[in-house]
């Protein structure tokens, strides 16, 4: 780094944000008109943009074109064969010139994790099962605040709330091993983490006492459950950790939350903060290999670094909670990217939950954790701007949700390129960044596919690109969109390899060790 370049302190960084002269201008006033429906302005498009915009990227393929394929993705590999698992399907991506469906409907569940278990010599697939939430409907735009009976769907839900485990060693014949309930009156699970080792980390509220959730679209506050999966056929709960104040009987702690005041009638219902774990807690080094740390995105409570030295007694080591204007509305901290830990940083993003910029813009944060007892925000990613030839001057005027959703999953083939990261950015498409200098992230490429859905149909057309995954060794990017899965390359990542290639290294220490 240039010696003349000053490194921002936490105090200076937050002061700049508060005054609007720093990396992103901030306003603390909440909109007077707000709900989860569309909020067009005179400048807004009256249609969905079906055009494609590309900068510094190439499209290699579109898998399942025209289909809504925005779900989470995971990789597995057997020899030179590589497979992409998504939305219950297994897709053969070995030869990127002709990716093809391999096993359609081979498993149940879209919140998925897959990893190789060396002791069992099997690929183990874990999928989540979640009870209904209290999201807005056409008749109840403010969710549970408009219609308390929306919670009846959660209360009366009779199916599994928890996770399912499968033997995926033969991707053509995936076999269910067990179902694990996190609690019959709880939330089930949303975003989970499994690395093939002894433990899985589940994003859950295990029962109906976790009720202090201000958000209009969730009935409960989730925490982190650690489960022993040494035998995936018989998982066992190890421990549960949550934010004090989340449960009935913890009202004194709840009232200490600044977020407990951000509820109707003090704020408009769809500007309420999302409290608790969005998930998952990422554990980059397996506990049985000496790992002791987990990194979680806890909504309005921000980043929490977990001490997992004793998995039976989870502890909070430290955290960074964003300024209040970022916590009220949407999911302030949605995902933590741990691909820069060797350099002493993590990246965190929020999730915009309302369309047409009917919320404060939620930035992507760079957080210095070299002193893990005191995480310090040092930068925000630049806010995307539309292409010059787009029919709108701001993404707020393009219909749908504008904001980051997910970075690539931590588990992937190859060594993570520490100076490059793509983000799924809803209606702004896929955005790619140079993070060689963590204090000055720079956008270097983008891909914006056509918008899917129908503007006249509630709940469609507002996401565009929801997820992203990277094969670091073959240097290809997968963008999960509502018009298919796009396979992309970017010169900043390197020249893509399209031919079948055995995986010789995975992105984390001992990940999928022993897989052949």
Segments the model singles out, each with a brief description of its role:
Residues 1-12, 16-28, 33-35:
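N-terminal secretory signal peptides
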Residues 13-17, 35-516:
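Feature marking well-ordered beta-strand scaffolds used for ligand recognition
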